[in-house]
């Protein structure tokens, strides 16, 4: 618990990175805090997309949850989009955009100020190639940033919550969810929130504790 207090102080101080969230997740996992451990491992993933240790520990933490939800199969287009998104973080894409901007400018400048035909073709080809990667990186980064703002995901911290067909208790009670389950928040109406889970099921919850990952 002392470690949890220490890491929380570091986060409150404005420091955010995968190692802090990963260690915080481990600390909660050792205390069998289901929702907290999953939440912080998911936060760590946002900063380090390709870290196997995070994925392994997250899988262990998910084994403590009550809800067993089979995700919907993904289309080839969606898998390809996720592949591009997971290649680099937004910060890494920003660096790549700056890098290819400089390379495009340098190669085009060398093309303009070089008099040898072979060299001009060489520099012009590389300037076009750099520009192509610049456009691709910018497009993927912009799309990823836009979707990240629109898609709000969170972890349920309530022991158990009921999911309703409409935002009132007179509607049909569809199913229940438990702590540690990851949901997507689609809409909100006063104290109600419309959520979606990995298998595509949707419904409304009221006064639930959902800690956003975004």
What are these regions (language model features)?
Residues 30, 34, 117-158, 164-172, ...:
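Boundary regions of SH3-family modules and the immediately adjacent low-complexity/disordered segments
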């Amino acid at each position: 618990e002392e470690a949890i207090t220490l890491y929380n102080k570091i986060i409150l101080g404005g420091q955010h990175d995968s190692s802090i969230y990963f260690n915080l997740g481990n600390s909660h996992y050792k205390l069998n805090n289901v929702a907290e451990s999953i939440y912080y491992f998911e936060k760590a993933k946002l900063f380090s997309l390709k870290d196997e240790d995070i994925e392994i520990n997250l899988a262990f933490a998910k084994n403590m949850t009550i809800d067993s939800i089979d995700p919907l199969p993904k289309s080839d287009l969606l898998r390809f989009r996720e592949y591009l998104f997971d290649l680099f973080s937004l910060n890494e894409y920003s660096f790549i955009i700056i890098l290819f901007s400089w390379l495009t400018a340098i190669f085009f400048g060398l093309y303009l100020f070089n008099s040898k035909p072979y060299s001009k073709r060489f520099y012009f080809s590389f300037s076009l190639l750099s520009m192509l990667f610049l456009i691709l990186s910018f497009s993927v980064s912009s799309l990823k940033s836009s979707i990240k703002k629109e898609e709000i995901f969170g972890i349920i911290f309530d022991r158990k919550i009921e999911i309703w067909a409409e935002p009132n208790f007179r509607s049909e009670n569809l199913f229940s969810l438990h702590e540690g389950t990851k949901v997507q928040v689609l809409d909100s109406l006063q104290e109600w929130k419309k959520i979606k889970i990995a298998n595509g099921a949707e419904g409304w919850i009221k006064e639930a504790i959902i800690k956003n990952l975004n």
